[in-house]
């Protein structure tokens, strides 16, 4: 079988709260680091989440 295009990533909050989301991304369409603004329930605000590897 062929290797899948999608890889699992972890989105870590830039607020420094330790909160994270897990998702996957298409390596071919988005080769760079993924950044998105999402809600952080610890600080109760929308903040930037940056891609990190799942350990």
From Swiss-Prot:
Signal peptide: none
Domain of life: Bacteria
InterPro entries for the chain: Ribosomal_bL33 (IPR001705), Ribosomal_bL33_CS (IPR018264), Ribosomal_bL33_sf (IPR038584), Ribosomal_zn-bd (IPR011332)
Keyword check for Ribonucleoprotein: yes
The entry's keywords: Ribonucleoprotein, Ribosomal protein
GO cellular component terms given for this protein: cytosolic large ribosomal subunit
Family, per entry: Belongs to the bacterial ribosomal protein bL33 family.
HAMAP family: Ribosomal_bL33 (MF_00294)
Full protein name: Large ribosomal subunit protein bL33
């Amino acid at each position: 079988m062929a290797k899948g295009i999608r890889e699992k990533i972890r989105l870590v909050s830039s607020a420094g709260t330790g909160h994270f989301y897990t998702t996957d991304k298409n390596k071919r369409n988005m080769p760079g680091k993924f950044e998105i603004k999402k809600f952080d329930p610890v600080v109760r605000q929308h903040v930037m989440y940056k891609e990190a590897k799942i350990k």
